[in-house]
């Protein structure tokens, strides 16, 4: 729209938000909140959680809790009150996600839920384990109801992997030690840092990204600056 014109452009270009579950995290609450963050709106949120790193000592228990939460979702007509997971934006989007999931499975990942082809725009939610950063689902934007869960040995590995992405919108750290959580989140090269919560927006707080995720700002006074021009008045008594 701005091609050939002298206009300012702001771009929001997608994300691959990570979450890190430390060994001392509340696993049930973390799983419940991360399903909301990763599967709400059928996973079609640029700041939704798409990759989860879990300390190896609690990996199995967390995965069990996460699977139970996802299995409780009800895929169906969004107009029906019992539906908790609706369709993707169009059939082509569901097919693209199915291709990404199948590619990652061929690369060695293990699906925890039935891997069914999409019916129209309806995609069965999926969790993939035994994943790594050589796999498609852990490196490219998913934008649908599927998430990869990767085991890590310690905080250092978690931070390194969270930073191993060309996207950078947000991140979250889940821990009983809030001070340590803040310290770790600050080491992630992104712009929205959250501890024991995720995928939360407030109109008063700027939404922005770095790397290949965003140019410009939305929300807060920064968002207004993207759409307005400053005016200065110099007034002197006559």
Write out the residue ranges for each language-model feature.
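ALDH superfamily catalytic-core signature
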Residues: 1-132, 195
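Conserved C-terminal structural/oligomerization subdomain of aldehyde/semialdehyde dehydrogenase
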Residues: 74, 122-238
């Amino acid at each position: 729209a701005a091609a050939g014109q002298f206009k300012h452009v702001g771009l929001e270009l997608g994300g691959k938000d990570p979450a890190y579950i430390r060994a001392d995290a509340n696993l049930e609450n973390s799983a419940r909140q991360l399903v909301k963050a990763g599967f709400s709106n059928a996973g079609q949120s640029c700041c939704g959680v798409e990759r989860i790193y879990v300390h190896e000592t609690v990996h199995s228990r967390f995965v069990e809790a996460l699977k139970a939460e996802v299995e409780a979702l009800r895929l169906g007509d969004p107009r029906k009150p019992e539906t908790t997971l609706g369709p993707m934006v169009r059939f082509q989007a569901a097919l693209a996600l199915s291709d990404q999931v199948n590619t990652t499975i061929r690369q060695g990942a293990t699906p925890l839920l039935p891997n069914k082809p999409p019916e129209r725009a309806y995609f069965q939610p999926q969790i993939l384990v035994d994943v790594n950063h050589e796999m498609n689902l852990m490196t490219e934007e998913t934008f649908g109801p599927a998430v990869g869960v990767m085991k890590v040995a310690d905080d250092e590995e978690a931070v390194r992997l969270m930073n191993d992405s060309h996207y950078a919108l947000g991140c979250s750290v889940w821990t009983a030690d809030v001070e340590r959580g803040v310290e770790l989140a600050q080491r992630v090269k992104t712009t929205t840092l959250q501890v024991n919560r995720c995928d939360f927006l407030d109109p008063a707080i700027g939404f922005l990204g770095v790397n290949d995720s965003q140019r410009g700002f939305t929300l807060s006074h920064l968002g207004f600056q993207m759409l307005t021009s400053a005016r200065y008045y110099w007034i002197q008594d006559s």
